[in-house]
């Protein structure tokens, strides 16, 4: 019998949800998606250090030796996203999704400018627009930015989508693709209700995507639907037939090792009759979002989470730049890392505030008092810097 992955691939485009190039090679998906958290995770893999260094060198060369560390790091962040994207496109035959800085989620003009910059970097590398999706958070401002970008020939993937109003607004804006977050919807309902689990068809995330799918197909919207953020195989099985599903390497591995019959659950040709068609403007969008506490809270949480991942990556890039440049930017790096981790601004970092691993915290905590002062970070990273530049 064929595996679940083999059967799923005949009815749904399977997309790898990872920045790990080896995982993408293993599963040979058509497309791949990345986000700040995935890029941050991939940046920890030693094999990819050369890609990080390439971006830092390129950004320093572009901006010049007099440019401040934060300028170089900010430029390198765009370079890194595109460098990983270019490597992914050497493996997958289809598209890669590259995300706009989540901190721009409520700024339409800044989002448009960043998208043009990212697609320009791809174009400079000889990659055409049809192979790239620019990921933008599904705020009203983000959706309006995507509407402009689509008219400019830049295709968009609207992410952090949790509510029906977001989906309808995206479809009416003519965006290429949306990514409703199945698992994060489930997370909210489990936390809100205290219920430990939901059977596949009862899963709130599955219900949400199914509703969006049938609505889009009933009213002939061209926007593709890519279910994302899965927590278990049942969610994937219940959405077999969706346009696309972006799946983590762990779940791809389970699908590829499980032999069982798989039934199509969603049918674009014969959708289940949807509710009456609606139209969404800014006022109705905001009203519907306020009324949907889950969507409102998860969108806010998602933007904050992706923003924090970017800030963490920037701090790591600043540290790496200091290593590459022989410590010239070291004091700035220490300050940036300290400010990022000192969440309550009281001048010390506790283990609970520390964003890194326990092993690193323990190494920096010389007096073992469970608190890091700026001098602890400076002396600890200084020793590491001396070793890496020796």
Curated annotation (Swiss-Prot):
Q: Catalytic activity annotated for this protein?
A: D-sedoheptulose 7-phosphate + D-glyceraldehyde 3-phosphate = D-erythrose 4-phosphate + beta-D-fructose 6-phosphate
Q: Which residues are responsible for catalysis?
A: 135 (schiff-base intermediate with substrate)
The metabolic or biological pathway listed in the UniProt record of this protein is: Carbohydrate degradation; pentose phosphate pathway; D-glyceraldehyde 3-phosphate and beta-D-fructose 6-phosphate from D-ribose 5-phosphate and D-xylulose 5-phosphate (non-oxidative stage): step 2/3
Q: What Pfam families does the record point to?
A: TAL_FSA (PF00923)
Query: Which keywords appear in this protein's UniProt record, sorted alphabetically?
Result: Calcium, Cytoplasm, Metal-binding, Pentose shunt, Repeat, Schiff base, Transferase
Q: Which GO terms describe its molecular function?
A: calcium ion binding; transaldolase activity
The protein's superkingdom reads Bacteria
GO process annotations (BP): carbohydrate metabolic process; pentose-phosphate shunt
Can you give the residue ranges of the EF-hand domain? 329-364, 365-388
Residues annotated for Ca(2+) 2 binding in this entry: 365, 367, 369, 371, 376
Where is the protein localized?
Cytoplasm
UniProt: Ca(2+) 1 binding residues: 342, 344, 346, 348, 353
Its EC number is: 2.2.1.2
The cellular component terms of Gene Ontology attached to this UniProt record, alphabetical and capped at eight, are: cytoplasm
Q: What does the sequence similarity comment in the record state about its family?
A: Belongs to the transaldolase family. Type 1 subfamily.
Q: What does this protein do?
A: Transaldolase is important for the balance of metabolites in the pentose-phosphate pathway.
The protein's name is Transaldolase
- Organism of origin: Prochlorococcus marinus (strain MIT 9313)
| Gene name per UniProt | tal
């Amino acid at each position: 019998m064929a595996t679940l992955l083999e059967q799923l691939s005949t009815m749904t485009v399977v997309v790898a949800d990872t920045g790990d190039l080896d995982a993408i090679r293993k599963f040979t998906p058509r497309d791949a998606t990345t986000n700040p958290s995935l890029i941050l995770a991939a940046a920890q893999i030693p094999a990819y250090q050369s890609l990080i260094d390439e971006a830092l060198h390129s950004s320093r060369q572009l901006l010049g030796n007099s440019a401040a560390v934060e300028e170089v790091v900010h430029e390198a962040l765009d370079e890194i996203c595109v460098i990983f994207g270019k490597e992914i496109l050497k493996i997958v035959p289809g598209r890669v999704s590259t995300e706009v800085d989540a901190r721009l989620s409520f700024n339409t003009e800044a989002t448009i400018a960043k998208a043009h910059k990212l697609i320009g970097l791809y174009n400079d590398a000889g990659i055409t627009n049809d192979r790239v999706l620019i990921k933008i958070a599904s705020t009203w401002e983000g959706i309006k930015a995507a509407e402009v970008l689509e008219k400019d020939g830049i295709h968009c993937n609207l992410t952090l989508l949790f509510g029906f109003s977001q989906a309808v607004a995206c479809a009416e804006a003519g965006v290429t693709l949306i990514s409703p977050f199945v698992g994060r919807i489930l997370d909210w309902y489990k936390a809100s209700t205290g219920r430990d689990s939901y059977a596949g068809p009862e899963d709130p995330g599955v219900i949400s995507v199914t509703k969006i799918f049938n609505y889009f197909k009933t009213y002939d919207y061209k926007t593709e639907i890519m279910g994302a953020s899965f927590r278990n195989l049942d969610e994937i099985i219940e959405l077999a037939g969706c346009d696309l599903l972006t799946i983590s390497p762990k779940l791809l591995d389970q699908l590829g090792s499980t032999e069982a019959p798989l039934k199509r659950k969603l049918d674009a040709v014969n959708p289940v009759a949807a509710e009456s068609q609606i139209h969404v403007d800014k006022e109705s969008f905001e009203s519907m979002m306020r009324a949907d506490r889950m969507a409102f809270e998860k969108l806010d949480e998602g933007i904050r989470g992706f923003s924090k991942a970017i800030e963490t990556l920037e701090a790591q890039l600043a540290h790496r730049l200091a290593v590459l440049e022989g410590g010239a930017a070291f004091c700035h790096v220490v300050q940036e890392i300290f400010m990022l981790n000192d969440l309550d601004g009281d001048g010390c970092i506790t283990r609970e505030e520390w964003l890194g691993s326990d092993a690193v915290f323990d190494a920096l905590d010389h007096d073992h008092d469970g608190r890091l002062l700026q001098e602890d970070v400076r002396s600890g990273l200084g020793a590491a810097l001396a070793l890496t530049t020796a």
